[in-house]
Each structure stands twice: as C-alpha cells, then as structure tokens.
Curated annotation (Swiss-Prot):
Locations listed in the record: Cytoplasm, Cytoskeleton
Keyword Aminoacyl-tRNA synthetase: no
Reported function: Actins are highly conserved proteins that are involved in various types of cell motility and are ubiquitously expressed in all eukaryotic cells. Multiple isoforms are involved in various cellular functions such as cytoskeleton structure, cell mobility, chromosome movement and muscle contraction.
This protein's UniProt keywords: ATP-binding, Cytoplasm, Cytoskeleton, Hydrolase, Muscle protein, Nucleotide-binding
Protein name: Actin, muscle-type
Length: 378
C-alpha cells in the first residue's frame, strides 16, 4: 500500500494475553503478530558499551530470553501492568506497523467483563500518551462472531490467558449470560510442563516454557473419547510422537498429547473446581432467553488459539449434543483462521462506513474525559 492510501486508515490492535495481533483495517490478516512479553536483563551488562537496553519487547525479548526475565503485562485477558503495556503499544505502532499513532484512529479489543477502570485507562493512554485522533474499544468475542459472518451465535473464545463463552444476539453481547473460565493456553502449557516432568524431562525456566508451548502447538490434540484414547495409548505406541529440543535431544511424547488439552473439558486435571468448556457453553445458553437458544445452539463459533487443537470441534459437538435437548440442531463452527478471528472482525468493523460515527474522537475525549468510553463502546 502507498503512504497516501494509508493516511487515516484505522489501526486494529488485538491485545491478547499471549500474542499481540496488529495491522490495518481492511486487511484480511494482521501485519504484526508477536508475543505480549516485556523482558528485562537478569544481570548487569557484561558487554560494556554494547548498548544494552533496559527492556525488550515481543520477538526480540523472545530471542534473548536466555538472559532476560520475561513478564506478560496481560493476565487472564486483563491488563495488569500499564507501564509494560505502554511499551508494547509503543513497539506495535513504531517498530512493527511503523506508523504515527497521531495520524490514525485506533480500534482496541478487550476481554468480556473487563473492569470499567481498565477501559478508561486504555482510553486515557491512547489519547494522552499516543495522541490518537480517535479510538474505540470492542469486545473480543463479538469481533470473532462478525468475522464468521454472523450477528447471532455463541462464541467460545479461548486464548492464552482466559476463556469465555459469550452469547450474542443481533450484534449485542448478553452480559448476564457470559461465562468466564480462567483456564486457557498458558495453563495448558504449564500442565504439559508438569506431566512431561513426570516422564523425566525437566522444564523449569521461562525460556523452557516457550519450548513446551511449541510442543503443545505442534503435537497436542483433543481426543473424541478420552478413556478409549488412554487405553489405546497404554496398549500400543501408535500415538507416540517425537520432538527435537533446541539442543538436539529428542523427547518422546505419548498420552500427554491429548491429556494436556483434555483439561479444557476436565479442569479437575489441574485442580480447578470449574466446569469444562462444554458445560460452560451449555450453562451460558441456558442463561439466555428460551426463544433465542435454538439460534445459539446452531451457531457455536470457536475462536482463539486454544481452539486450534485438532479434534476439538468434533468433541464439542459430541459433548453439547449430550447436554442439549435431543431434537436440537447443534452446529460447531471452527473457521480455519480462528486464531486471528478477533483481529479479522476488528478489521471488518473498523472499515464499515456505518461504523465511522462510532469512533470516540479526541474532541469528545477532551470534553468528557475517559468515562466517555462507557457511553460509546458497548
């Protein structure tokens, strides 16, 4: 794209607990996807005059992880460290997208049931630190639904830090029926570290956790019938796969491949008393008006990286069919690009002509202050 064309194009930034997805409205995929990490040196610099920075963001932090302490400013989908978050946004605009934020409207995303103070602080930072001309905060799950071409349905959005079931009717999330589950990709990575340790492999540091995350993404899957899969794994080696560690050591992983994501259906695996995602989906539907349940059952949309496991859609279909009334038509929609569907939905929304009057402008912000966000974004 030429510079003239990018003048005033809205920026879309989906801040996840694990990955930041950022790019330009109207694009079909984010230009920049990088880990939501800020790393700081563990030791005082040895290499004098090497121009060591006091902090690194994203991929650079990832590549220097051996000498850094890595921190995630977003926990369970909610921003907990604002100074680090500001560093991440700065990095997004200036290093990744290479734009001046004061020239573009910015669409940010937030977790459902985000505390009010949080969206006010986001709004304040955008206008006061980055001087944006206009901004908007949209709920992640709603954007995923738009990306699937629907305005009614129930979204299971599961990322790195948090999972939600969000029923949406004609474009509006129904807050009383939203289910939040503090169980997501990061917990699955930790659980995989634990069960691999039981097998005799040791993974402890933040750097090693990233290796385990890679094993999880490449080799894990959801079993259709967990008990049966366990029996198969016990009696044969057909489910075993090997993985080469960065130092050349090869490890073998068997039933861990499906025991790890099974936690989404059986949170008791990691000592959580919560219901699994199939039950939270059902409970969320049951909290909705009886007249719209049929539409929700027929439009179960999966979104987020933790829904990327092979086999998850079939398993959800099976589990929800078992819970729902026997005559109910149940459909699970798992778009192939669901890892980025929140961002894609944001890209669609920000480029709609009807959306242009929805932006919070700098002028409105100056008149009303941060609380304007509650009146304009819902």
């Amino acid at each position: 794209m030429e510079d003239e064309e990018e003048e005033q194009t809205a920026l879309v930034c989906d801040n996840g607990s694990g990955l930041v997805k950022a790019g330009f409205a109207g694009d079909d995929a984010p230009r920049a996807v990088f880990p939501s990490i800020v790393g700081r040196p563990r030791h005082q610099g040895v290499m004098v005059g090497m121009g060591q920075k006091d902090s690194y963001v994203g991929d650079e932090a990832q590549s220097k992880r051996g000498i850094l302490t890595l921190k995630y400013p977003i926990e369970h989908g909610i921003i907990t460290n604002w100074d680090d978050m500001e560093k991440i946004w700065h990095h997004t605009f200036y290093n990744e997208l290479r734009v001046a934020p004061e020239e573009h409207p910015v669409l940010l995303t937030e977790a459902p049931l985000n505390p009010k103070a949080n969206r006010e602080k986001m709004t304040q930072i955008m206008f006061e630190t980055f001087n944006v001309p206009a901004m908007y905060v949209a709920i992640q799950a709603v954007l995923s639904l738009y990306a699937s071409g629907r305005t009614t349905g129930i979204v299971l959005d599961s990322g790195d830090g948090v999972s939600h079931n969000v029923p949406i009717y004609e474009g509006y999330a129904l807050p009383h029926a939203i289910m939040r589950l503090d169980l997501a990709g990061r917990d699955l990575t930790d659980y995989l570290m634990k069960i691999l340790t039981e097998r005799g492999y040791s993974f402890v540091t933040t750097a090693e956790r990233e290796i385990v995350r890679d094993i999880k993404e490449k080799l894990c899957y959801v079993a259709l019938d967990f008990e049966q899969e366990m029996a198969t794994a016990a009696s044969s080696s057909s489910l075993e796969k090997s993985y080469e560690l960065p130092d050349g050591q090869v490890i073998t992983i068997g039933n861990e491949r499906f025991r790890c994501p099974e936690t989404m259906f059986q949170p008791s695996f990691i000592g959580m008393e919560s219901s699994g995602v199939h039950e939270t989906t059902y409970n969320s539907i049951m909290k909705c008006d009886i007249d719209i349940r049929k539409d929700l059952y027929a439009n179960n949309v999966l979104s987020g990286g933790t829904t990327m496991y092979p086999g998850i859609a079939d398993r959800m279909q099976k589990e929800i069919t078992a819970l729902a009334p026997s005559t109910m038509k149940i459909k699970i929609i798992a778009p192939p690009e669901r890892k980025y569907s929140v961002w894609i939905g944001g890209s669609i929304l920000a480029s709609l002509s009807t959306f242009q009057q929805m932006w919070i402008t700098k002028q409105e912000y100056d008149e009303s202050g941060p609380s304007i966000v509650h009146r304009k974004c819902f």
